[in-house]
Amino acid sequence: MLLLAPQMLSLLLLALPVLASPAYVAPAPGQALQQTGIVGGQEAPRSKWPWQVSLRVRGPYWMHFCGGSLIHPQWVLTAAHCVEPDIKDLAALRVQLREQHLYYQDQLLPVSRIIVHPQFYIIQTGADIALLELEEPVNISSHIHTVTLPPASETFPPGMPCWVTGWGDVDNNVHLPPPYPLKEVEVPVVENHLCNAEYHTGLHTGHSFQIVRDDMLCAGSENHDSCQGDSGGPLVCKVNGT
């Protein structure tokens, strides 16, 4: 992940949206324009993570810039800062469903609508969540299907093993090399008050200032975390066998 205190735990900071889904990643404070990817993981098996999507922006080519999760045949969940305020033209945005290697077999899908949480302003204030409506529903299969969202009452105890996936950097300033495989890494849930204390290390905000808010969830461990390239992507945890 993004390190504010390299000698401490590197913590994956996620916001728990109103939908009660821990399904996207937010960068650390002070790094709002940097996305996050995977460090310390391995290539994901082709049979896993069928809800993973890649968000693409138009340029010299359709460049990957954020991750997301398919939560319905026609809806993708991602981070608000991935699309707000930079994405003004829907024609410049595409969604690529689960693929093992970026760019090799693209079938880019157009987006018809972006819904950003009305309370989102900047990452540090929380509510960093957005929904993308696809122009057409996708065909659900064993290779492509939705992730299960937890109920609002679900809790994620400290130490609970979860997984982060994406196509981001594999280390600080080290880009994912060709053929750009989807990566995965297992990370434990970290208590919010510990996470908040770690994020204050080296800052001058005072400990009364809450960096990790109540609508956020922390997960991560030393050398196993996220890095630049996949903000908005999923954090998934196995609960009751699902």
From Swiss-Prot:
Active site: 81, 128, 231
Tissue specificity annotation: Expressed in colon, lung, heart and synovial tissue. May be specific to mast cells.
S-S pairs: 66-82, 162-237, 195-218
Keyword Secreted: yes
Span of the signal peptide: 1-25
The Peptidase S1 domain, residue ranges: 38-242
EC number assigned by the record: 3.4.21.59
Domain of life assignment: Eukaryota
Stored InterPro entries: Peptidase_S1_PA, Peptidase_S1_PA_chymotrypsin, Peptidase_S1A, Trypsin_dom, TRYPSIN_HIS, TRYPSIN_SER
Propeptide segments, given as residue ranges: 26-37
Alphabetical UniProt keywords: Disulfide bond, Glycoprotein, Hydrolase, Protease, Secreted, Serine protease, Signal, Zymogen
Membrane-spanning intervals of the chain: none
Keyword Oxidoreductase annotated: no
Subunit annotation: Homotetramer.
Full protein name: Tryptase delta
Lineage start: Eukaryota, Metazoa, Chordata, Craniata, Vertebrata
